[in-house]
Amino acid sequence: MKRTYQPSNLVRKRRHGFRARMATKAGRKILNARRARGRKSLSA
């Protein structure tokens, strides 16, 4: 049986990276929320 998590840095960056977050309004909202919370890392 194939497992659900098949790590790939390329897919990780494309789906959850900073540029992907900035591309949508909802993504920018996530970044702002993480900044407000004082997160050390904002995105993958």
Swiss-Prot record:
One of its GO terms (cellular component) is ribonucleoprotein complex. It holds the Pfam family Ribosomal_L34. One of its GO terms (molecular function) is structural constituent of ribosome. Keywords: Ribonucleoprotein, Ribosomal protein. One of its GO terms (biological process) is translation. Belongs to the bacterial ribosomal protein bL34 family. NCBIfam families: rpmH_bact. This is Large ribosomal subunit protein bL34.
